[in-house]
Amino acid sequence: SIISNNNQQSYDYLIQYLAHAIQKAEDKPGVAIVLLSDSGCGKGTFYTLLNKIWGRSSIEVNDVKHIIGNFNAALQNNFIVFMDEALFKGNHEGMERLKNLITEKTIRVEKKYMQAYDIESFHRFFAASNSEHFAHIPIDDRRFCFYRVSNQYKQNLDYFEKIHQLIENGHQVQGFLHYLQHLDIKTFNPRSRIITQEHIDQRIKSLKGFERFWYEALQNHGFSFISTSHRLLTTDNIDWLEKPFFVATETLLLCFNQYDRQSQRYESIQSQQISKIIKKLCPDANAIKHKSQTFEKEKRGYRLPGLFRARQLFETYFGCKIDWMQITDTEIKLEIEAERIAESEQEIMLDAYHESLDET
């Protein structure tokens, strides 16, 4: 329960994952378990349990180079591979190698002064890290299952001493092993791993470029979270809760470039690219020309749906629910009223269209 942070769904998946490793060792799961927490929360103790069950066919490495580097003999004759203090943030090449190791049925092993050779792989990979951001996790990731380990017993030496005593007690481990051997996993598919809140958080932390910028805009109800001395935020309806919400393409570009300079991490974007990206992140956005008191001339831009709808569309793109910043009751009322006005405008436009058809 400590590893699963008292989440029943997470606990069930982990127990069945371990049972699968016992009962169907020849069926490589294609999913790695990643444990994240502060130091002293029990990640190492979990490996002690794994080592007690699998013994000499388990290995703990403190340097991921022993697994993803040129010389990876540690993979030979080991079934459980536990990478302690693993961190792949900024290590794109290493991450790609790890992904291949997690899924490939045959992997290449290389020892010093020996020719590389291929072995059949049934490995179960585990990783533990104290870092808040383990690695760049893409939106469509299917190889990792993340666990936020509970800090309930953080640095509690007495508690973990008792756990270690239980693990060293052969009867306790034998009982647990018997349980795993006889657990019903007929309907369990390790590839259908659960999406934990930690998995969502890792994916959010991995957003970059315009995706990251758009996410921040959705979280902050608009683009005013960007600090700038330019007349950037004087455009009509820059607060997303005002309707109808129009944002000029040049405003989006300027806002993003300002955000880009602040972050100094994301690739720059051109105005012609915005349309394609907006359609992915917010399919309901309509490209239109708009003129207002603020604009001397008509400007090209986008009429965006309500904030709630825009968030829903981003969740669809993202593939799961997101914990958005709360909106006040007053803001909710404004949003509901804005949606009502938008619907009325649509009805008026439809009526006008039908009248024009009748006239013809």
Regions inferred by a protein language model and the residue ranges of each:
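AAA+/SF3 P-loop NTPase mechanochemical coupling elements
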Residues: 71-76, 110-128
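Phosphate-handling catalytic cores of nucleic-acid transaction enzymes
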Residues: 8, 28-32, 36, 49, ...
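Conserved AAA+/SF3 P-loop NTPase catalytic/coupling segment centered on the Walker-B
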Residues: 79-102, 134-141
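A short helix-turn-beta junction within AAA+ P-loop NTPase domains corresponding to the substrate/partner-engaging
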Residues: 136-153
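P-loop NTPase catalytic core of nucleic-acid-dependent motor ATPases
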Residues: 1-82, 86, 94, 145, ...
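Conserved catalytic/switch belt of AAA+ P-loop NTPases
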Residues: 95-117
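Conserved phosphate-binding loops in nucleotide/dinucleotide-binding enzymes
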Residues: 153-168
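DNA transaction DNA-binding modules
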Residues: 38-39, 186-360
